[in-house]
């Protein structure tokens, strides 16, 4: 039969939201990096070079996405899957690989493209019943392998949840035939396996139990192993550190304020109002994205949007 390309129509509101929030994020990082850059003796703009580079690439891919024929994902999924895995292995084992904090940096970035690839897997396996659901789950093995060798276990967990969510939605909407309890259980089986593994770690590894306890009660830590939780409580609520160690949470957060501690830095500098405004922008981005996904009728379009 004749092939009909599937290309999305631009959602200009979403484009404006994405570009505005990204630009605001870059400006926020520039402001928050100044204490760290002053401490290191480097210009703030130099530390943002990588961020601007990724911003340019992301913006280009965003607009390029409106000219792409997404049925390619379904028609050539085996080739695309093999290329994705080959590039990931090259980034992991090539002489030019970059390691940062014990993690393969470029491989860690590459892994996050997998959900788009998984949308193509869903599309290619539609109508195949339980066999199609099984094949979709088998495609997760490549992502798990790359995440394991990177190592990037948080990405493994997050992407597994995302892909299983996409698969469950496809099963419930009848993409693999009649929705049955067996197919739903099969679709969520990786999540059940992750839960079982986590419970096993809680039982078998005392260190895991200790670290989890510090999340809920960091002040009970006398060896300062839970310094992050203590710093969070200090910055957010002014609760002093009660262990035997010492930590200048405010100064430490200020020096690392443009990374994982951005929200804490915003609270420390500008108060709760700024925190709620920042969260509102992120929630607006997520809400509009899910709104676009819910408006799609086809499996491929809905999966790519998700």
Regions of interest found by a model, annotated:
Residues 93-127, 148-156, 220-222:
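Membrane-interface segments at transmembrane-helix junctions in multi-pass inner-membrane proteins
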Residues 292-306:
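Loop-to-helix entry and N-terminal half of a specific, functionally important transmembrane alpha helix
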Residues 179-277, 300:
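Hydrophobic, glycine- and aromatic-enriched re-entrant/interface helices and adjoining loop segments
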Residues 36-40, 87-107, 205-216, 248-250:
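Membrane-interfacial helix-loop-helix modules of multi-pass inner-membrane proteins that assemble, modify
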Residues 130-149, 153-201:
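Hydrophobic alpha-helical segments of polytopic membrane proteins
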Residues 44-76, 110-128, 165-176, 287:
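Transmembrane alpha-helical segments and their membrane-water interfaces
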Residues 53-61, 266-289:
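Hydrophobic alpha-helical transmembrane segments
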